[in-house]
Structures are given as C-alpha cells and as structure tokens.
C-alpha cells in the first residue's frame, strides 16, 4: 500500500535508486496504490550518468509491496520491500533490466514488457 510521501526502491536499471511518491494517479480522492498502479514520484537518489537524474519527476508502476495482496483463490503474497519500475508516457519501462521478482497482478494491468523482463513472476 503506497501513499503520498512513501519512499520506494527501484527495481530496474534506469539509474534511480530511491523514489519519493508525490501523487497516486487515478482520481482526485485516491489515497493508496497497490501492485500494478501508477504513481508520480521524484527521484531522491540516482547513480551518475544515468537515464534519470536526481530531482526528476517520473511515473512509476508498483511491482512489489510489503502490504499483502489477496488473490482470488484465497492465498496472499507479500514482499520485503516497496519497489517500482520507472515508466515513460507509453507505459513502457525506461530501464532495460528488472531486478527481483514481480507480482502476477501486473499481467492484468497489461504491463507485459515488465513481466517479460522480470527474472521471476510470483
């Protein structure tokens, strides 16, 4: 469960390391974002000579949350961290690699490029 002012880790090689959530997209009164949702973030930490710089405002899709996700079969899945992947306006990842597992719920949101780049889909 991601809300405004949440600090996110980055699960790709776009160059950002830490992100600060500015806004949850999807309506003026929307407070929380889960896996597969898009948030607007600012880059708090970045590596030198990267595609994104510190202070850039980027769109991010959430791929892992520490809050458990309920599945239709009654099972739950949760991760150790809150992580996202930096995307462009065409909903494609800026980076070329994805680190760590991603949730299967991304498939329903049509993030197929992220699913195919991920080493593991849980």
UniProtKB/Swiss-Prot annotation:
Keyword Nucleotidyltransferase: no
Alphabetical keyword list: Ribonucleoprotein, Ribosomal protein, RNA-binding, rRNA-binding
InterPro entries: Ribosomal_uL14, Ribosomal_uL14_bac-type, Ribosomal_uL14_sf
GO biological process: translation
A Pfam family reported for this protein in Swiss-Prot or TrEMBL: Ribosomal_L14
GO CC, one annotated term: cytosolic large ribosomal subunit
GO molecular function ontology, one term from the record: large ribosomal subunit rRNA binding
Known role: Binds to 23S rRNA. Forms part of two intersubunit bridges in the 70S ribosome.
Subunit structure: Part of the 50S ribosomal subunit. Forms a cluster with proteins L3 and L19. In the 70S ribosome, L14 and L19 interact and together make contacts with the 16S rRNA in bridges B5 and B8.
HAMAP family (alphabetical): Ribosomal_uL14 (MF_01367)
Family the UniProt entry places it in: Belongs to the universal ribosomal protein uL14 family.
Designated name of the protein: Large ribosomal subunit protein uL14
Originating organism: Geobacter sulfurreducens (strain ATCC 51573 / DSM 12127 / PCA)
């Amino acid at each position: 469960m991601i809300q405004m002012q949440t600090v996110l880790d980055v699960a790709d090689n776009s160059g950002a390391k830490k992100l600060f959530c500015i806004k949850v997209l999807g309506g003026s009164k929307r407070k929380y974002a889960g896996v597969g949702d898009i948030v607007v973030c600012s880059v708090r930490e970045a590596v030198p000579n990267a595609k994104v710089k510190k202070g850039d405002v980027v769109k991010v899709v959430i791929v892992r949350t520490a809050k458990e996700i309920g599945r239709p079969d009654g099972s739950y899945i949760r991760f150790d961290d809150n992580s996202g992947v930096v995307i462009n306006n065409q909903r494609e990842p800026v980076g070329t690699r994805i680190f760590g597992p991603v949730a299967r719920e991304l498939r329903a949101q049509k993030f197929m490029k992220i699913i195919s780049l991920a080493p593991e889909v849980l």
